[in-house]
Swiss-Prot record:
InterPro entries: Enolpyruvate_Tfrase_dom (IPR001986), Enolpyruvate_Tfrase_sf (IPR036968), EPSP_synthase (IPR006264), EPSP_synthase_CS (IPR023193), RNA3'P_cycl/enolpyr_Trfase_a/b (IPR013792). The gene is aroA. GO terms for molecular function: 3-phosphoshikimate 1-carboxyvinyltransferase activity. It comes from Brucella abortus biovar 1 (strain 9-941). Disulfide bonds: none annotated. The keyword Transferase applies. This is 3-phosphoshikimate 1-carboxyvinyltransferase. It is found in: Cytoplasm. Its EC number is 2.5.1.19. Belongs to the EPSP synthase family.
Length: 450
């Protein structure tokens, strides 16, 4: 099931000041985990603010296929979970569509069950490597039948009893860390993840909220040791999902670039493992005011007031990459309008996202007149303040929602329009994007539709 069955190109044109107030859809990471942990916990979980994109809904369907009962009443999702250790073998393969997070976390969750579970996905997901999650599962006793290169379609055959392991995560990946911790939920004894570089910590925080026996210690070198005691009880919770910082990035950068704009974005997740983009834009001279910082569901949340700003190029420290890995495409757009040179390094993870995101961004920038250099793990962008001469190109999105949204943002501020070859897959993470941007005054339309 590929999104490109009927591609819908879209075009963004130079827009007047963007103004207004918006509330961003719920955070994707927390939404996936809310469905998973709610489906696994005993009793009832109630979720408000859930991101209802296709990716998250696919995770919900997978949990239903393994015994969880999920329904929606008004704005509230209500889950009756099966209880930790009580997932059922699904009758058919679990279809994750385009959702890498949903697929990888669920592999961890079900791998240590004494049952057979098959995973399938769309053309884009079937190209993405799963070995980074499968390798620790193999150490725990899980058998894997996979397509070449540890890709989907694949089947996990769980052991009678899983072995607890201590696993040092070889790359900065919250998905790998989370998959091992979730596998540890159904494993006797203590499963340990050693994380040299901290990544988003929603799994740890939320598992603790659900009652898991999970502890985190940071040693003197800054290495995190996360221990989970398996086979404990999880209890249903009430969750209000804060707004997704990765989705916030698009209207935020648009407001910075379109002259005269002032936009307020409500209820944004400000977890420090996710705010690298805001920090970087502020270093570039962005006028971003953080209003009413508060705690909601154990997470830092705030409102952002964003005003059009003259940006200047910066060197982004590579160690910041894990806290903004999904935001580099739209940062590259901001850099295209900044004075001077912006250097982004440590981007190897971008090569294994929904597309080779680094190459896709570089090609899109070149097609629209931006002077940039793509390195093996880096991207250097030399900007043109005011966007003079930029635009006029069509961007190949490679079924990647973030590439599509980033270049539509570009077209709002560039001299000439920017077209993306497909916009259908924006629905995977931000179904309201087109309507929300139009409400602020952005000129974005499906091509052929005026």
């Amino acid at each position: 099931m590929s999104h490109s069955a009927c591609p819908k190109p879209a075009t963004a044109r130079h827009s007047q000041a963007l103004t207004g107030e918006i509330r961003i859809p719920g955070d994707k990471s927390i939404s996936h985990r809310s469905f998973m942990f709610g489906g696994l916990a005993s009793g009832k979980t109630r979720i408000t603010g859930l991101l209802e994109g296709e990716d998250v809904i696919n995770t919900g369907r997978a949990m239903q296929a393994m015994g969880a009962r999920i329904r929606k009443e008004g704005d509230v999702w209500i889950i009756n979970g099966v209880g930790n250790g009580c997932l059922l073998q699904p009758e058919a393969p679990l279809d994750f569509g385009n959702a890498g997070t949903g697929a990888r976390l669920t592999m961890g969750l079900v791998g240590t069950y004494d049952m057979k579970t098959s995973f399938i996905g769309d053309a884009s997901l079937s190209k993405r490597p799963m070995g980074r999650v499968l390798n620790p599962l193999r150490e725990m006793g899980v058998q894997v039948e996979a397509a070449e290169g540890d890709r989907m379609p694949l089947t996990l055959i769980g052991p009678r009893t899983a072995n607890p392991i201590a696993y040092r995560v070889p790359m900065a990946s919250a998905q790998v860390k989370s998959a091992v911790l979730l596998a540890g939920l159904n494993t006797p004894g203590v499963t340990t993840v050693i994380e040299p570089v901290m990544t988003r910590d929603h799994t740890e925080k939320m598992l603790q909220d659900f009652g898991a026996d999970l502890t985190v210690e940071t040693d003197k070198d800054g290495v995190r040791h996360i221990r989970i005691v398996g086979q404990g009880k999880l209890t249903g919770q009430t969750i209000d999902v804060p707004g997704d910082p990765s989705s916030t990035a698009f209207p935020l950068v648009a407001a910075l670039l379109v002259e005269g704009s002032e936009v307020t974005i409500r209820n944004v997740l400000m977890n420090p493992t996710r705010t690298g983009l805001i920090l970087t834009l502020q270093e570039m001279g962005a006028d971003i005011e953080i209003i009413d910082p508060r705690l909601a569901g154990g997470e830092d949340v705030a409102d952002l007031r964003v005003k059009a700003s003259k940006l200047k190029g910066v060197v982004v420290p590579p160690e910041r990459a894990p806290s903004m890995i999904d935001e580099y495409p739209v940062l590259a757009i901001a850099a295209s309008f900044a004075e001077g040179e912006t250097v982004m390094d440590g981007l190897d993870e971008l090569r294994v996202k929904e597309s080779d995101r680094l190459a896709a961004v570089a090609r899109g920038l070149e097609a629209n007149g931006v002077d940039c250099t793509e390195g093996e793990m880096s991207l250097t962008v030399r900007g043109r303040p005011g966007g003079k001469g930029l635009g006029g190109g069509t961007v190949a999105t490679h079924l990647d929602h973030r590439i599509a949204m980033s270049f539509l943002v570009m077209g709002l501020a560039s001299e000439k329009p920017v077209t993306v070859d497909d916009s259908t897959m924006i629905a995977t993470s931000f179904p309201e994007f087109m309507g929300m941007m139009a409400g602020l005054g952005a000129k974005i339309a499906e091509s052929g539709a005026e």
